[in-house]
Amino acid sequence: MASSSSQRRCVFVGNIPYDATEEQLREICGEVGPVVSFRLVTDRETGKPKGYGFCEYKDEETALSARRNLQSYEINGRQLRVDFAENDKGTDKTRDQSQGGPGLPSTTTVTESQKQIGGPVDSNMHQPVGLHLATTAASVIAGALGGPQVGSQFTQSNLQVPASDPLALHLAKMSRSQLTEIISSIKLMATQNKEHARQLLVSRPQLLKAVFLAQVMLGIVSPQVLQSPNIVQAPSHMTGSSIQDAQLSGQNLLPPLAQRSQQLSRAPHSQYPVQQSSKQPFSQIPQLVAQPGPSSVNPPPRSQVKVENAPFQRQQVVPASTNIGYSSQNSVPNNAIQPSQVPHQALPNSVMQQGGQTVSLNFGKRINEGPPHQSMNRPSKMMKVEDRRTTSLPGGHVSNSMLPNQAQAPQTHISPDVQSTLLQQVMNLTPEQLRLLTPEQQQEVLKLQQALKQDHMMQPS
């Protein structure tokens, strides 16, 4: 016990100039407290000093104070290195025996701390790390946290952190062994009491920053790791809702068509299951059913029409049983969209329903209103899908008079300005926005865009 207590009261003093005497060193060590003894180690053969010695104090507190205050004390052009005797006695003896003097680089000694962190062999474990290394490490951390980026090769001109950074200045005065001891203490605390270590670092963010800065200075954390994209960028796998929020915050497509929930009852003979559609940021775009281009051939008798209940909600797929005839004289593609309102006892022949009104996009043209059973005696640009029976009417004639016991919702046309705005939004969809849609929706939007371009070219200038 006495030997252990004596070692804790004794400090190792290294990097002593060869011309310094024991009296000078005793006076220097006596500045922090009473000195019991000081021994300057000399070579047995030559009698010359080896450049280090040992100072014993009366108590451990004085020895600890000497370790803090005498570190980097300058004497005759050298800075003293002070540490506890049991930590550095064997290391410095081995170094001096292999190199023949203090302060020379060693190639045979690797300290335990260097083995743990995998750093290179360095004889200046007790020398101050210096302002350049501290500010360089602080600059790397600042770049990783969003500040100016610093390359892997650092020069004094590349330093982005001001020299007045108090934390960097303080760590610059410490040696590598002291920084290693701090990191080891934090690691030991985290191992023994994880919650206490977490509370300590959270309550003292400067301590957390100092530990991080010390790891960069010692090479435990390399600048290349801090500059990797995984540190400074957000993860690439964003959830669907976050992508939708980001897209919808910047633009809201077809706002009049996304204000109320929509419902469509399934036809009695329908055997198609209800499908759950994936969430799409642009699900407000109505489904386009008509095929562009003049044709005298009827399309397939059973086409599927997707009806969206609301943005980001379920969709229903209802088989359509109407054969739509195309007139060979109709040079304008039939690409109109006619959503109609459907209550809970909904009309099964409705293609789209929206907010209590029927919306018809007829390339900016108004279509004459008429009773629900009135047939149109000219090529039609509107299409209705009937689920109760199959009807084939050439020339685009669609009649609702054959539907029994059904109430027709009142038809209301939106203003030409709104129609023009909606069509313009469809035409201005970017490829990135189209990729967010389903393949069927992409094809239908492309067909509508092509039809709008053809109609615009055919209109007189």
Curated annotation (Swiss-Prot):
<dbReference type="GO" id="GO:0031047">
    <property type="term" value="P:regulatory ncRNA-mediated gene silencing"/>
</dbReference>
<dbReference type="GO" id="GO:0042868">
    <property type="term" value="P:antisense RNA metabolic process"/>
</dbReference>
<dbReference type="GO" id="GO:0031124">
    <property type="term" value="P:mRNA 3'-end processing"/>
</dbReference>
<comment type="subunit">
    <text>Belongs to the CSTF complex. Binds to mRNA. Forms a complex with cleavage and polyadenylation specificity factor (CPSF) subunits CSTF50, CSTF77, FIPS3 and FIPS5.</text>
</comment>
<dbReference type="Pfam" id="PF14304">
    <property type="entry name" value="CSTF_C"/>
</dbReference>
<keyword id="KW-0943">RNA-mediated gene silencing</keyword>
<feature type="compositionally biased region" description="Polar residues">
    <location>
        <begin position="272"/>
        <end position="282"/>
    </location>
</feature>
<keyword id="KW-0507">mRNA processing</keyword>
<dbReference type="InterPro" id="IPR035979">
    <property type="entry name" value="RBD_domain_sf"/>
</dbReference>
<feature type="compositionally biased region" description="Polar residues">
    <location>
        <begin position="105"/>
        <end position="116"/>
    </location>
</feature>
<comment type="function">
    <text>One of the multiple factors required for polyadenylation and 3'-end cleavage of pre-mRNAs. This subunit is directly involved in the binding to pre-mRNAs, especially on the 3' non-coding region. Required for the targeted 3' processing of antisense transcripts that triggers transcriptional silencing of the corresponding sense gene.</text>
</comment>
<dbReference type="Pfam" id="PF14327">
    <property type="entry name" value="CSTF2_hinge"/>
</dbReference>
<dbReference type="Pfam" id="PF00076">
    <property type="entry name" value="RRM_1"/>
</dbReference>
<feature type="compositionally biased region" description="Basic and acidic residues">
    <location>
        <begin position="84"/>
        <end position="96"/>
    </location>
</feature>
<feature type="domain" description="RRM">
    <location>
        <begin position="9"/>
        <end position="87"/>
    </location>
</feature>
<dbReference type="InterPro" id="IPR012677">
    <property type="entry name" value="Nucleotide-bd_a/b_plait_sf"/>
</dbReference>
<dbReference type="InterPro" id="IPR000504">
    <property type="entry name" value="RRM_dom"/>
</dbReference>
<dbReference type="GO" id="GO:0031123">
    <property type="term" value="P:RNA 3'-end processing"/>
</dbReference>
<dbReference type="GO" id="GO:0048589">
    <property type="term" value="P:developmental growth"/>
</dbReference>
<dbReference type="GO" id="GO:0005634">
    <property type="term" value="C:nucleus"/>
</dbReference>
<keyword id="KW-0539">Nucleus</keyword>
<dbReference type="GO" id="GO:0045892">
    <property type="term" value="P:negative regulation of DNA-templated transcription"/>
</dbReference>
<protein>
    <recommendedName>
        <fullName>Cleavage stimulating factor 64</fullName>
    </recommendedName>
</protein>
<dbReference type="InterPro" id="IPR038192">
    <property type="entry name" value="CSTF_C_sf"/>
</dbReference>
<dbReference type="GO" id="GO:0016441">
    <property type="term" value="P:post-transcriptional gene silencing"/>
</dbReference>
<dbReference type="InterPro" id="IPR026896">
    <property type="entry name" value="CSTF_C"/>
</dbReference>
<dbReference type="GO" id="GO:0003729">
    <property type="term" value="F:mRNA binding"/>
</dbReference>
<dbReference type="InterPro" id="IPR025742">
    <property type="entry name" value="CSTF2_hinge"/>
</dbReference>
<keyword id="KW-0694">RNA-binding</keyword>
<feature type="region of interest" description="Disordered">
    <location>
        <begin position="84"/>
        <end position="127"/>
    </location>
</feature>
<feature type="region of interest" description="Disordered">
    <location>
        <begin position="260"/>
        <end position="282"/>
    </location>
</feature>
